[in-house]
């Protein structure tokens, strides 16, 4: 809590007032001493912590005859180039984090299945190798009841293997193109944290 000396306009805390009056015994709770007034707190103004700071100024006596805390926003940099450099430096870790999140989502979806013949087919590395093997087998693909991502099954065939291969290749290309566009948007934005990186992705399996 802050108090203002109504004569000198000096702002002081309880501890500072006690220290200035070592021979005075104050009760608990601490009363407003004579010659002082309680300063009601107010919210700090909005400011950019990269280029600005905020500091208390002399409290103001309101029309209600109460004192209120006042703030002042102060520019850190007087030179525009220094300010621009500080802003640019502050955006580097933000862009890096956003781009890492984009790549992580791209890779998650890459291994999160493709929809073929109304079935979600696994696209993890092992499954991709198996389907590639079936494509290479051509007409010799055995008819197997293949378990899909939702627990149901589908019968393997040459046509299915080709369709899965095509769908997987399309997914990969679409994911990489979309991730690249998002990264470009993040890198170009003066407010990279505001770029929406969660929507617009190609659909993958989201659970039964």
Describe every region a protein language model picked out.
Residues 1-208:
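A preference for well-ordered globular domain cores
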